[in-house]
């Protein structure tokens, strides 16, 4: 049984911990800096393969001391993006495998530099977007002789929106603000460029329902680096219900809260409720030439909340945790096949979907799951 250190007992870390422990192949060390946070998750899971610890993982000395005392083979960071470089530095020094969920471009570049020459693996951006969307798009790309455009679209939305933003906080508020406020990598006319967030507003119709999509930061991952010389257009946009972008523009641009993110975070967390009743929409479209003909292929999927260990977990929790667990599982099953920096697109879509963790993407659940769970009181407390 391999020892895994999971940093952060929040929304995603709690499910990562449960999935890995339930597999029977991993013993999980869950750490959080807040008193009782890791203990509460471990008690809620009630699993013998879990241990709780309290320390500040952003402090190099504390993290190093824990690693040397408890000997994990890999570290999963479920911490806010701004903590990950410090964690990755310690992991590099201790010769462990590293996985994170960051969407931040600058953090990923720092991790890439740290991974140079490493015999262990460094795999950032292991969540949904970036993460699974890159894997799905890469599979489509392989079907074409010549590429023209690659469009990545992902959204985590409340199933039943009833506020002016038509949105609920389903994951990290810091992460949402970061995506909405930072420059966005794109390829336009064959050239890598940075475009403004909250721009490029478009309508998109999926299963007969109308959504909007607009530029946000980080979701392109490393696909631009991998295929930049082969594609004319490549971009990533976040999917929301119509009208959301206009409201966020008012907050971030009109009221200048992009320059006062702590205030924006406080406003959002005081006004926008959390929910476990969400839906994740994944949409990738690739256009190019096959056998001399211009064609398009799509990957479209909706993932709903699911019951894990008799408790309801949101779709964004399911997709994010399944993404990083499946990638780590593939690496640790064949560690000799990997070393250094590993981009998400180096993993095969079918390998992810057939993995015991990645299979959550394959069946996706239904929109009835959360309704039934609420009706019989199975939503529960996750920690």
Label for each model-derived stretch:
Residues 34-37:
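Helix N-cap at the beta1-alpha1 junction of Rossmann-like dinucleotide-binding domains, i.e.
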Residues 143-383:
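C-terminal catalytic/substrate-binding lobe primarily of soluble NAD(P)-dependent oxidoreductases
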Residues 45-59:
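Rossmann-fold cofactor-recognition segment
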Residues 12:
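Hydrophobic/small residue at the entry helix of a nucleotide-binding pocket
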Residues 4-8:
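Conserved N-terminal Rossmann-fold NAD(P)-binding element of oxidoreductases
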Residues 101-124:
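Rossmann-fold NAD(P)-binding glycine/threonine-rich loop
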Residues 56, 72-85, 95, 101-106:
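N-terminal glycine-rich "phosphate-gripper" loop used for MgATP/nucleotide binding
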Residues 57-70:
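Conserved Rossmann-fold cofactor-binding substructure of NAD(P)-dependent oxidoreductases
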